[in-house]
């Protein structure tokens, strides 16, 4: 693997990853890859860019576009070609700048690879193989239990929210205003604000994915010039869009609260914006936003 390529984990050397076939990756990992790569966006490399890096020709990519899950089909076709491996896939994702995918799926990929190696060893020996050190590394504890202030540490009753707030540190004052207007009024909404509600010590990508997908009914994006420079906000926005392609579930709500020098992000242009900068509609702003967040 090339220098700087994030590996699935230190337990497996790069040479092992390079020799492991894609068959080592299970359905769950493949589905998560599809969530990241099926979204067509000009600001991030999608499955078509990955296909080109895998040396698929234009006509082949056109054929893949006919499938509901082109990423899954791409991986199926590529794994039959020479040189396809888990390590090569990670290397290509790194070259395409998809560090968000590598950070989020790294632990799951390592787990799949360990299981695959263990299974191969068992089949080769033709008898059950008990390796405590490997078994213990495969057994995963629910590391998403106890990630927020009011979470049940045992994971029996995870804390849920009306909306996840995607914001930059420089926009924290407006987030405080959101808390005052939406939580401390008759609306009584429950917002997930990372700096206030999330406990330290866990991967930021994993926490964001868990909260956006499973714990929050909506996501509010505080758009600003600083937002456009944030990799964390970029990941959160693309992940939320991947859960609701075309905004059919009205899951994501962009907010423009101050004038911008830079162009509004194209990935959000097709979604209705709550514009706090328009003095003609400012009196209706909080009512509209609260109503949108209260919808089932």
Swiss-Prot record:
Single GO biological process annotation from the record: MyD88-dependent toll-like receptor signaling pathway
Primary localization class, coarse: cytoplasm
PROSITE patterns xref list: DEATH_DOMAIN, TIR
Keyword Ubl conjugation on entry: yes
InterPro entries on file: DEATH-like_dom_sf, Death_dom, MyD88_Death, Myelin_different_resp_MyD88, TIR_dom, Toll_tir_struct_dom_sf
Cysteine-cysteine disulfides: none
Subcellular location: Cytoplasm; Nucleus
Gene Ontology terms, MF aspect: TIR domain binding; Toll-like receptor binding
Start and end residues of each Death domain: 32-109
Keyword set includes Transit peptide: no
Residues modified to Phosphoserine: 244
One annotated Gene Ontology cellular component of this protein: cytoplasm
Pfam families, per database record: Death, TIR_2
PTM info: Ubiquitinated; undergoes 'Lys-63'-linked polyubiquitination. OTUD4 specifically hydrolyzes 'Lys-63'-linked polyubiquitinated MYD88. Deubiquitinated by USP3 that cleaves 'Lys-63'-linked ubiquitin chains leading to inhibition of MYD88-induced NF-kappa-B signaling.
Keyword tags: Cytoplasm, Immunity, Inflammatory response, Innate immunity, Nucleus, Phosphoprotein, Ubl conjugation
Annotated segments matching region Intermediate domain: 110-155
Domain TIR: 159-293
Purpose of the protein: Adapter protein involved in the Toll-like receptor and IL-1 receptor signaling pathway in the innate immune response. Acts via IRAK1, IRAK2 and TRAF6, leading to NF-kappa-B activation, cytokine secretion and the inflammatory response. Increases IL-8 transcription. Involved in IL-18-mediated signaling pathway. Activates IRF1 resulting in its rapid migration into the nucleus to mediate an efficient induction of IFN-beta, NOS2/INOS, and IL12A genes. Upon TLR8 activation by GU-rich single-stranded RNA (GU-rich RNA) derived from viruses, induces IL1B release through NLRP3 inflammasome activation.
Alphabetical list of PANTHER family matching this protein: MYD88, MYELOID DIFFERENTIATION PRIMARY RESPONSE PROTEIN MYD88
Domain notes from UniProt: The intermediate domain (ID) is required for the phosphorylation and activation of IRAK.
Assembly information from the UniProt record: Homodimer. Also forms heterodimers with TIRAP. Binds to TLR2, TLR4, TLR5, IRAK1, IRAK2 and IRAK4 via their respective TIR domains. Interacts with IL18R1. Interacts with BMX, IL1RL1, IKBKE and IRF7. Interacts with LRRFIP1 and LRRFIP2; this interaction positively regulates Toll-like receptor (TLR) signaling in response to agonist. Interacts with FLII. LRRFIP1 and LRRFIP2 compete with FLII for MYD88-binding. Interacts with IRF1. Upon IL1B treatment, forms a complex with PELI1, IRAK1, IRAK4 and TRAF6; this complex recruits MAP3K7/TAK1, TAB1 and TAB2 to mediate NF-kappa-B activation.
Protein name as it appears in the record: Myeloid differentiation primary response protein MyD88
Gene transcribed to yield this protein: MYD88
């Amino acid at each position: 693997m090339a220098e700087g390529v994030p590996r699935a984990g230190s337990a497996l050397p790069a040479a092992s990853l390079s020799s492991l076939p894609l068959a080592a990756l299970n359905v769950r990992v493949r589905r998560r890859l599809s969530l990241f790569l099926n979204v067509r966006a000009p600001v991030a490399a999608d499955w078509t860019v990955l296909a080109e890096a895998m040396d698929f020709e234009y006509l082949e990519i056109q054929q893949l576009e006919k499938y509901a899950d082109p990423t899954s089909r791409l991986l199926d076709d590529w794994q039959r070609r020479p040189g396809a491996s888990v390590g090569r896939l990670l290397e290509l994702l790194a070259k395409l700048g998809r560090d968000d995918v590598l950070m989020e799926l790294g632990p799951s990929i390592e787990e799949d690879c360990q299981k695959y190696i263990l299974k191969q060893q068992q089949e080769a020996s033709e008898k059950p193989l008990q390796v405590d050190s490997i078994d213990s590394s495969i057994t995963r504890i629910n590391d998403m239990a106890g990630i927020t202030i009011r979470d049940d540490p045992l994971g029996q009753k995870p804390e849920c929210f009306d909306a996840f707030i995607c914001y930059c540190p420089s926009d924290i004052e407006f987030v405080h205003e959101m808390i005052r207007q939406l939580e401390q009024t008759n609306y009584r909404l429950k917002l997930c604000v990372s700096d206030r509600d999330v406990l330290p010590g866990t991967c930021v990508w994993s926490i964001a994915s868990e909260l956006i997908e499973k714990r929050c009914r909506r996501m509010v994006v505080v758009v600003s010039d600083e937002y456009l420079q944030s990799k964390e906000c970029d990941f959160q926005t693309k992940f939320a869009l991947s859960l609701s392609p075309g905004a059919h579930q009205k899951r994501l709500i962009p907010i423009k609260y101050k004038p911008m020098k830079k162009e509004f992000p194209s990935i959000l242009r097709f979604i209705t914006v709550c514009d706090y900068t328009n003095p003609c509609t400012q009196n209706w702003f909080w009512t509209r936003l609260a109503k949108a967040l209260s919808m089932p």
